[in-house]
Amino acid sequence: MLRLKNINTYYGKVHALKNVSLHLGEGEIVTLIGANGAGKTTILNTISGVTPAGSGEVLFRKEPVTALTSDKIVKYGISQVPEGRQVFKPLSVEDNLELGAYLRYRSREDRAVIRRDMTQVFALFPRLEERRRQLAGTMSGGEQQMLAIGRALMANPRLLLLDEPSMGLAPMVVQEIFRVLERLRRENGVTILLVEQNAKAALKLADRGYVLETGKIILEGPSAELLENAEVKRAYLGKDKKEIWER
């Protein structure tokens, strides 16, 4: 479904991604793990057009999307849940979800279909329905994360990009969100690319994983193998979180 070929992305003179290549199959959950500053968020932003690639190619369903603007990439079927949630705090839950479907309204899609999709979001996250008229800024962090995911789903994506969805949340809330991600894959066929600080939880959820260091992919493989990899264990899964990739 998604393929990155030799992607190089820059922030000014800073070479953030260095010849990154990866792929996701239809219906897969794939996770990116690595230390802070490794380039995980930059990969998501490059895919979604927020930080365009300097060179290389992004293919979605075999179509090049590298040079497209973010709104066109959303229309193609890619939605991103940003780090830090970034909900519209002065607006209600329902208004936030409506904004997630903004491009669908602009294309004059049947409003009944959009309302049906909102009902499906409420089925995934019942607390959002209970608080549909509540201002987003008055909600807990976990509820805001649910809202951010629901807002992304309102664009009706085939590929969902998630950036650190567990950040700052209680373990029970994280478990609930991860159950929803698995349900989206199982029941709706949504493909998921997950950036996650909780490497162990992410690898248990995902089919495959990539390990990044300083803008390069240094390891990849099935999640079960990465969970048993000695270096991954030492760097991300055990008590000793010290960076070990430096040689």
What spans do the regions from the language model cover?
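Conserved ABC transporter NBD signature motif
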Residues: 56-64, 76, 109, 113-118
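Helical segment within the ABC ATPase nucleotide-binding domain
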Residues: 175-189
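ABC-type ATPase nucleotide-binding domains, specifically the catalytic core motifs of the NBD
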Residues: 12, 30, 68, 93-116, ...
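ABC ATPase C-loop
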Residues: 152-153
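The feature captures the beta-strand-to-loop junction immediately N-terminal to the Walker
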Residues: 33-35
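Helix-to-loop junction immediately C-terminal to a conserved catalytic motif
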Residues: 48
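Conserved catalytic motifs of ABC-family nucleotide-binding domains
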Residues: 156
